[in-house]
Curated annotation (Swiss-Prot):
Swiss-Prot/TrEMBL keywords: Cell junction, Cell membrane, Leucine-rich repeat, Membrane, Nucleus, Phosphoprotein, Repeat
Ranges for the LRR repeats: 23-44, 47-68, 70-91, 93-114, 116-137, 139-161, 162-183, 185-206, 208-229, 231-252, 254-275, 277-298, 300-321, 323-344, 346-367, 369-391, 392-413
Protein name: Erbin
Modified positions (Phosphothreonine) in chain numbering: 485, 917
Family under the similarity heading: Belongs to the LAP (LRR and PDZ) protein family.
Lineage: Eukaryota, Metazoa, Chordata, Craniata, Vertebrata
UniProt region (Disordered), positions on chain: 464-489, 506-542, 615-681, 803-867, 997-1021, 1075-1192
Cell compartment(s), UniProt: Cell junction, Hemidesmosome; Nucleus membrane; Basolateral cell membrane
Biased composition annotated in UniProt, kind: Basic and acidic residues: 470-480, 506-532, 632-641
GO process annotations (BP): basal protein localization; cell adhesion; cellular response to tumor necrosis factor; epidermal growth factor receptor signaling pathway; establishment or maintenance of epithelial cell apical/basal polarity; integrin-mediated signaling pathway; intermediate filament cytoskeleton organization; intracellular signal transduction
PDZ domain sequence ranges: 1321-1410
Residues bearing the modification Phosphoserine: 440, 444, 569, 598, 602-603, 620, 715, 852, 857, 872, 931, 1158, 1179, 1286
Subunit structure: Interacts with ERBB2, BPAG1 and ITGB4. May favor the localization of ERBB2, by restricting its presence to the basolateral membrane of epithelial cells. Also found to interact with ARVCF and delta catenin. Interacts (via C-terminus) with DST Isoform 3 (via N-terminus). Interacts with NOD2 (via CARD domain).
Function: Acts as an adapter for the receptor ERBB2, in epithelia. By binding the unphosphorylated 'Tyr-1248' of receptor ERBB2, it may contribute to stabilize this unphosphorylated state. Inhibits NOD2-dependent NF-kappa-B signaling and pro-inflammatory cytokine secretion.
Amino acid sequence: MTTKRSLFVRLVPCRCLRGEEETVTTLDYSHCSLEQVPKEIFTFEKTLEELYLDANQIEELPKQLFNCQSLHKLSLPDNDLTTLPASIANLINLRELDVSKNGIQEFPENIKNCKVLTIVEASVNPISKLPDGFSQLLNLTQLYLNDAFLEFLPANFGRLTKLQILELRENQLKMLPKTMNRLTQLERLDLGSNEFTEVPEVLEQLSGLKEFWMDANRLTFIPGFIGSLKQLTYLDVSKNNIEMVEEGISTCENLQDLLLSSNSLQQLPETIGSLKNITTLKIDENQLMYLPDSIGGLISVEELDCSFNEVEALPSSIGQLTNLRTFAADHNYLQQLPPEIGSWKNITVLFLHSNKLETLPEEMGDMQKLKVINLSDNRLKNLPFSFTKLQQLTAMWLSDNQSKPLIPLQKETDSETQKMVLTNYMFPQQPRTEDVMFISDNESFNPSLWEEQRKQRAQVAFECDEDKDEREAPPREGNLKRYPTPYPDELKNMVKTVQTIVHRLKDEETNEDSGRDLKPHEDQQDINKDVGVKTSESTTTVKSKVDEREKYMIGNSVQKISEPEAEISPGSLPVTANMKASENLKHIVNHDDVFEESEELSSDEEMKMAEMRPPLIETSINQPKVVALSNNKKDDTKETDSLSDEVTHNSNQNNSNCSSPSRMSDSVSLNTDSSQDTSLCSPVKQTHIDINSKIRQEDENFNSLLQNGDILNSSTEEKFKAHDKKDFNLPEYDLNVEERLVLIEKSVDSTATADDTHKLDHINMNLNKLITNDTFQPEIMERSKTQDIVLGTSFLSINSKEETEHLENGNKYPNLESVNKVNGHSEETSQSPNRTEPHDSDCSVDLGISKSTEDLSPQKSGPVGSVVKSHSITNMEIGGLKIYDILSDNGPQQPSTTVKITSAVDGKNIVRSKSATLLYDQPLQVFTGSSSSSDLISGTKAIFKFDSNHNPEEPNIIRGPTSGPQSAPQIYGPPQYNIQYSSSAAVKDTLWHSKQNPQIDHASFPPQLLPRSESTENQSYAKHSANMNFSNHNNVRANTAYHLHQRLGPARHGEMWAISPNDRLIPAVTRSTIQRQSSVSSTASVNLGDPGSTRRAQIPEGDYLSYREFHSAGRTPPMMPGSQRPLSARTYSIDGPNASRPQSARPSINEIPERTMSVSDFNYSRTSPSKRPNARVGSEHSLLDPPGKSKVPRDWREQVLRHIEAKKLEKKHPQTSSSGDPCQDGIFISGQQNYSSATLSHKDVPPDSLMKMPLSNGQMGQPLRPQANYSQIHHPPQASVARHPSREQLIDYLMLKVAHQPPYTQPHCSPRQGHELAKQEIRVRVEKDPELGFSISGGVGGRGNPFRPDDDGIFVTRVQPEGPASKLLQPGDKIIQANGYSFINIEHGQAVSLLKTFQNTVELIIVREVSS
């Protein structure tokens, strides 16, 4: 990394020849990605004078550095320093110190020993106060402390008499010390964006002041003593509430720039005309009704802006401003202009739009230098003929709709005045009907809205019409700015509040009820706490959210809407979010009366979201049901049931829909922030979003949810919490591990909170289905609390989840209760053997309810074999359980499950990557948890138990819960990085199995569960990058995880575990994975890949790691929001505390995704989604039959995306694509299936991890289609997490990943086997020469299959006699998998594009009828 360093050496020309040592005085190590100060620096400690270490990742300064006593300049901006060592006092010759953009909270007292220090730049650090010793730096001439947390300055600050520049912008200052009157040499003082209510009197003494900023404060008037600043040339007091400027200001004889914009002025002082040197006067955005006649005295003024006022006429004296170059008076009430303005001989730009002008004076023809004039939105009937003399005119705007700057004018005689005038077709002008509403800059800043807009701006790649409603408000700042400075004042305050809360929560989190509400400003924390308080509500919400999320998954457009709403209401997040969640839940479950108010809110919100985001119905075949999305929460239960099948089918189609540009956009947004919201269609999601909306962290988290289906929300909350060290999200796993443990030990209500959060997660993951019995629902609420207490180490959230599931499902799946095991304890399972208690977060994810209830439902499960198609575990658990719950409620759902299972049967032995399953199991396609492929892949109910060797012991046909337990044992078997994958998968399975297979070892789960929240993120980064690779969902998940991780930083890990079960699963991966963000995706991936178990195999929550296990498993220490990096400006920039970069400088490559996630992630998701969907669309080959099923449109796009992604992946990691370990099959299924976990995205995780990821079935499979995954994983971690892969992208990913895992042969006998009892599964390797030499038919939306018309599979129809496949394939062979990509339920065009894009070697898994 040091190759970039430059050595500036002062050399005597031939010194090297004379053998003399060179004298190194300057070293520049800027932008070298250094994590510590290079040791070679110390060899020059005697001569080194300047050291530049800008923009690295240095966390601490070694003591040796302070032996460089000749050092004059030390430049350390943009690093990860959290403290400035006291030994800095040794640098007695230090003159310039730059430590801006770090996480430094305070200066050491003995910095006073740096006597010659003249320049200190410490902006963008969370410095709350200056030490008294700081005022002893008597030689200080420049001090920059912008964007810190200063509330006051030392009383003896006036000792710094040599100060010339003092910048204190973006702090919380309310007053200045009186001793500052001694700073007579001060020339520049910047007090902008503070909290002053009046101009400090001490300013009167600063006689040397030349430039003074006091904008964006709370001033109400400008005192006359400002006039005593005779040297003042620049005065900016804009963006205040100034109602009056005293006349004394007129004595500032040297004033050149006076900025009074955005205040409440109704008049200007009459003496303003005496400011003879003013060149710029800005008085726009006030309430001026007239300009004083004395304004003509401003003879030097060149720019005068009085727009956005209430001026009705201009004084004739204004004609004396002969030097005027720019005049703006738009948005006033001018009816005419004084003819004197003709004397503005130097005017070049004249803005007069939006007035009431009916005529213009002839004298305007004398403005010979006029180049641009805007006259639109007036009442002009014509123009004076003298305009023909305006020879330099380049633009004359007469209408807002004008197509060209200059429109030809025609001569005409005015019928009234009989004068020659100019006119054209735009005259007479038509006044606007509606009043123009101007949004002033000083308008209060809405952090949630701003964040929403930022996210939207980050999703430009796939802008959809559905998203436009969310983007109505103009963006305030570019989303690409790393640290928007100055930060919006409200955001800054929010960060400060969060920091305070974090510190407070550190102490309170363990003891405090997670339900405790905070102030609105602490809404993020507040929300988390609220979650704790409103456990039952939260649970309800979760359910409804799960259902809704399923719907949203089905219709991404709706999902996206959800998110904006959630974001929009950060202030009321705690209550509103919960209420929304409960509302949604209620709608879905119909048995949660407790939260009726909330329900209503969330219903409306969701309805609004649904309206905003057009459902993807048109694209998906079964989408129509999905249309219900979040509009009818109360009908959700029924709707989801009926939708279950559709939803599952739609999952795939949704992905396809997502593929479409608009859909993609939705998906992308989902993957970003929207994606989370989408995942959480229901209010619960909103709750999570609200909680984290202010902190971008939520964005990532939600993405995880999308990808993993349930973890995302949890993750978001958890991360948020961990970051902020708040109780609010404790319910989920938000509390740090330690905190949670404390809560658990205390049997605190935190369980309730956890339950609440978990419920949310569950809902997000459609865990509602997990709840086995409606009867359990009321009971579960209580039970969850009880169980939480009982579990102790288990997560409080487990119970909550359980409640959620029960409530939501009124479920028939007792197994679902086992989901509580997600916490890592089967205790819960034991407690409620008959019902599955989904963990709030784990369960949601694990259940994969989003798939379809049928898949999860035990009855359906029966037929389902081991074909838990490669759904992402999250998806499986989420989609399957949740939707299943809904389906279960309907009862008929189970048949659907069977159907899905059947499809699964065909690909049964190919548990394949979840994505493959996705392709194969359309009915299961709905991924509540994952928005893309993973959802598509719903697992059948059949679940295979795997021994520690990853071998299925027996197929368990479980309604969904079974898959978890089976996998669980395997999982703990490989608790390493590989375990990440397997454990992730296992967790999912475990969640499902808890009930049926309480046998699963918690031990195995704990590792994977371990830092669940962290793992969610981590997985995305760490080994699970492989999982990420598995699918777009994984990518999304990884993204979210990554983002979460990024936001949370170290805290992320702790929070991760709080994520939903899937995420939790991810944690296992995480801990294996160093608990990197990749772990998130890893977990998700694992979850996805139930071993052959049902796609939706229910995974007993108990199988998940308990909180403690999760923690011990390697979860990174929970990070306080303020810990690590105390909310430096950069840290909190947009994300707020949760975004703390503190996570420790910059993450290693494995975890880089968390850090880089933002833009690159977005790009990736955007790119992949669009590409994948496009790939689908671009199946381009005739094989792709768009008609076949309504899916086709979306599928074709998805296929295109997949195709593109596959190409990328193959190009990047061709070697991985074909590798398919026998174990891999199972593994891929679990790993790949977790698209969310895969969210890590291929780039996030190194190929190695991809290649080996234990599946939940305990098998170790190569990472699903590592090449594809790798390409993303290997992309810089940043890129690695496509910020939020679109649903299509996820699907595509899944499909690609599925390819990675060889068919799951063991599950061979699963429901799929039912389809082809006499079939033999064969693995074939074909070398392209130059092509594959065979033709295929069939596929979803294909033209039909000549061999089995009722089968949507891909069949070989023709083999070239002498071609590469002539001796390997024969007509009638059904292709189950190719290079790890599942060909089950795949669209024809997609299959074609995949086969064509594969590199030379294509490894096929086919099913051949041995005896019919």
